[in-house]
Amino acid sequence: MKAPIFKSISTNKIDFDLKNFSGKYIVLYFYPKDDTPGCTIETNDFNKLLPQFKKINCEIFGISKDSLNSHKKFKKKYGIKFDLLSDENKEIIKKYKVWGKKQFMGREFMGLIRSTFLIDKKGKIIKIWKNVKVKDHAKEVLETLKDLIK
């Protein structure tokens, strides 16, 4: 399946266009909220493994509906070395179908479903993780990519 194309503004103040990354592998991970426990663990884990992802020609981007300002604070606080993309209007979130019903403490509500998409050099989605459990997730994504490119 072809990855939905989108444009956004990144935390590095560049106009992000997915098309500009053809020829590279891409990890797009969608997370609910900056600076919350699970999202911080997941982001820090991807950050720690970033050099290994870069070695195999892979870029990482985190996406949530937080504002660009929130993302900048989050990046600075934890020394995150990759771009975060803001999707306050949920346009990207809806294109990737990661907005849906969630449950927490017996309450049902609509929210962002923690998900990761692995995209190949030609812009094709080659692996999807939905309802991600953050522990060891970044490592699993890296190992999956390494296995796929052997």
Short names for language-model regions:
Residues M1-K150:
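Chalcogenol-based redox active-site neighborhoods
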